[in-house]
Amino acid sequence: MCIAYEAVAWGAYVSTWQDSLRIIKKVDRANFGMCWDAFHVLARIWGSCALPSGKIEGGDEALRRSLEELVDVLRGEDGEKIFYVQLSDGEFYDPPLGEGHKFWVQGMDERLIWSRNTRPFPLESEFGGYFPIGEVIKLILTEGRFQGWVSFEIFDWRMRDEKFLPEQAAERGWKSWVELNII
């Protein structure tokens, strides 16, 4: 059995994939590795549901540096510690998250609210997705030479509707997968 440890964007102590890797190295067990979650990485250093632009100032540069570091890790001896990559998009909020927004919860970290409600399948711009997921996964698979599992983790408020069918999620997921494979 393998255990995949994952940093979350709103984490108080472990909020980046680099934090996860440090802990994984301290645990030092062959079956203890990382789930590298694109949403948490992007929501921490690149995007924001609470800003009108949807982007953190300096986010492009922070993401570039983070991905360069990830590629170095994937190509090095620690690459085997990344067990799988998890993908979703992030929905652009217009208006931005704040008091009065339908997802607003007083006292809750904005990234947690975002994560729980508006993570469509990758590349679903028709559902507000705007993260650079295509560029991210291309870099991980080509330059990083990642050959492990890739999964989708979706939290989309539209799927809570009782009229929403599992078949619809499967269709959306398949469409996303096909589009990612074209990139």
Identify the residue ranges that each predicted region occupies:
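Short active-site-adjacent structural elements
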Residues: 93-96, 158-163
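Tryptophan-centric aromatic hotspots in well-structured domains and transmembrane helices
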Residues: 40, 147-149
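Substrate-binding and catalytic surfaces of secreted/luminal carbohydrate-active proteins
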Residues: 110, 118-121, 127-143, 156-159
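A structural motif corresponding to the C-terminal end of an alpha-helix
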Residues: 1-3, 27, 73-81, 135-147, ...
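A general structural detector for well-ordered alpha-helical segments in enzyme core domains, enriched
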Residues: 19-23, 66-74, 132-139, 169-177
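Short acidic/histidine-rich active-site segments
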Residues: 151-154
